[in-house]
Amino acid sequence: KAARLNVGLPAEGRIILFVSQKVTDERKGMEYFIDAIDRLVKQHPELKDNTSVAVLGGNTQLVCDRLALKAYPLGYVSDERRIVDIYRSADMYVLPSLEDNLPNTIMEAMACGVPCVGFRVGGIPEMIEHRRTGYVANFKDSADLATGMNWVLQEADTEQLGSACVSKVARCYSGQSVAMRYIEVYNELIALKRYIV
């Protein structure tokens, strides 16, 4: 709750987070996000009473009025502590990106224990373990994206998801784990060179 108060978000209720440097960038999938939120609210109108959306990035004011849930345009933020508080305020992070290799925002959200929902594209399915650290929706499928959001919000054990997210980041993306993988690759190359020579 302290994190939410620090960034001007409501202390009560659930918050869905969307982050992009420029939220109107077509590649980040805002149109699919808007459609999925609309579908989610139509299927579960009770969410209007206790769920809102926080939008972080440039041009947030251009999209918040189009969302079927109460939305908080946070604008562009560069202060790292504030960004961490924003992630910690969220109950779920949604990135319906249409093309992305290894989105830092998913890594950042997971490091803060926030379950993620995204499309099956690029490196996203490698980052989000389906129904373990979040939900991987079929590509460009707003209905499945809405299903994933509902699963995280109303069906999944969010505490277990959050713990799995933190573990995954520590295991796969920490500086130490990345360094160890480089060492393994170098050792394999050295062994291969000895074999060839």
Where are these regions (language model features)?
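A short helix/loop element that forms part of the nucleotide-sugar donor recognition site in Leloir-type
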Residues: K1-G8
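Conserved donor-binding/catalytic core segment of Leloir-type glycosyltransferases
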Residues: P10-K28, I34-D38
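Nucleotide-activated donor-binding/catalytic signature segment of Leloir-type glycosyltransferases, i.e.
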Residues: L47-T51, G57-R81
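Short alpha-helical donor nucleotide-sugar binding micro-motif in glycosyltransferases
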Residues: D85-A90
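Short hydrophobic beta-strand element within catalytic cores of glycosyltransferases
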Residues: P115-G118, I128
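Conserved acidic donor-binding segment of nucleotide-sugar-dependent glycosyltransferases
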Residues: H130-R131, Y135-S142, W151-A156
